[in-house]
Regions:
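N-terminal glycine-rich cofactor-binding segment
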Residues: 9-27, 44-72, 100-114
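C-terminal hydrophobic helical "lid"/dimerization subdomain
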Residues: 2-3, 240, 284, 288-336
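Glycine-rich beta-strand-centered segment in the early N-terminal region that forms part
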Residues: 25-40, 53-93, 132-135
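Glycine-rich phosphate-binding loop and adjacent beta-alpha segment
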Residues: 236-296, 334-336
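N-terminal Rossmann-like NAD(P) cofactor-binding module of classical short-chain dehydrogenase/reductase
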Residues: 82, 230, 253
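A short acidic, Gly/Pro-enriched loop at the edge of an enzyme's catalytic core
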Residues: 221-229
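Mid-domain Rossmann-like dinucleotide-binding core that forms the NAD(H)/NADP(H) cofactor-binding site
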Residues: 135-216
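NAD(P)H dinucleotide-binding glycine-rich loop of Rossmann-like/cofactor-binding domains
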Residues: 89-172
Length: 336
């Protein structure tokens, strides 16, 4: 790791501290590669930490795991990359099945080791994914959340009783994951409804997805109406809404984890043979597919991204916390 650099440290709930001469005491691994971070996104899980609701992310940590960087030295010096932040063992039954997201012996960038809210970061070589040097750095930084979306949509496809293009689909939430989900479904020709309580995000859904977003706090959502429901929020209320709105024989894919516990209508799930499918992150195949989809325009032009300098990280978190940030994704620039 670089001796001194600019970095943002999560120092306490609702407190992100910009440090001009941060010194890392992290012990790097032999196979770690040093990256100069060009762009890094703020994830919903970073917001959970910011709110003090993620016991896995403690004060003193550099958050951030959605990134684009440039290799600093070695034979690939200057090459642009992103990376899978899940550092897995590579030898357990799940890793050998290609389901490395389920590896129980895993570390994670921005959780168990320092993340990308900094000018530099190290990452194991096995996690690197090379990208075209001409590709937009902000778009590359969206690969990680897009990979979660690819995984979620693939699960919906695998568990639906008819082709996804024929499935009337409900997307709950129009944050980054929800918006990207709607955009990918749009590329498949899916007829959908998008729910979002933050009215500031409604114009973005209209402009980029081409559907009018609905505020479920102001408008009732039909019961037993959707073939597929993808919950990108994961609160107790949206969990209940997912089950009530899905058709008999339909599929619910749960992506969001706003609430750590939930009560669901197990009677409906059983009597109407509803498939409830959990979705945790992605595997490396999903990750690489997401990069390809971003590059070929399957997620649209991504012009809705909001860019801010790393020094304004605390302000970015506050605006997301207060609901005043209209954009579904803020990208921080460490070398602004």
């Amino acid at each position: 790791m670089i001796d001194k650099m600019q970095a943002v440290v999560y120092t306490a709930p609702q407190e992100m501290t910009f440090i001009n001469d941060y010194h890392s005491n992290q012990v790097d691994r032999d196979d770690d590669v040093l990256l100069r971070i060009q762009a890094v996104g703020i994830c919903g899980s970073d917001m959970h930490a910011y709110h003090g609701k993620d016991p896995r992310r403690n004060p003193g940590l550099i958050l951030g795991h959605e990134f684009c960087g440039e290799i600093v030295d070695g034979p690939d010096k200057g090459k642009k990359v992103t990376g899978n932040p899940l550092i897995t063992c590579g030898k357990c039954e799940y890793c050998l099945q290609g389901r490395d997201n389920l590896c129980s012996d895993r570390d994670m960038i921005g959780m168990s080791r320092q993340g990308a809210f900094a000018q530099y970061m190290t990452i194991p070589k096995q996690c690197l994914v090379h990208t075209p040097n001409t590709m937009n750095s902000n778009h590359i930084a969206l690969t990680e959340p897009a990979a979660t979306v690819v995984h979620a949509v693939n699960l919906a496809i695998e568990n639906s009783f008819k082709p996804i293009s024929e499935c009337h689909t409900l997307v709950i939430g129009a944050g980054a994951i929800g918006l990207l989900t709607a955009l990918l479904l749009k590329s498949y020709g899916v007829k959908m409804k998008v729910l979002e309580t933050n009215l500031a995000r409604h114009p973005c859904v209209q402009d980029h997805v081409g559907v009018k977003a609905v505020n479920p706090l102001a408008e009732a959502i039909d019961e037993n109406a959707f073939d597929v429901v993808i919950d990108c929020v994961g609160s107790e209320k949206t969990n209940a809404l997912s089950i009530s709105s899905v058709k008999a024989g339909g599929t619910v894919v749960n992506v969001g984890l706003l609430s750590w516990t939930s009560s669901i209508d197990i009677r409906k799930i059983t009597l109407q043979e509803v498939k409830l499918v959990g979705c945790y992150t992605y595997n490396m195949e999903d990750f690489k597919s997401a990069l390809t989809f971003i590059e070929n325009g399957s997620f649209g032009d991504l012009s809705w991204i909001e860019e801010m300098p790393l020094s304004e990280t605390d302000a970015a978190f506050k605006s997301l916390h207060n609901g005043t940030m209209a954009s579904a994704k803020v990208i921080l620039k460490p070398h602004f």
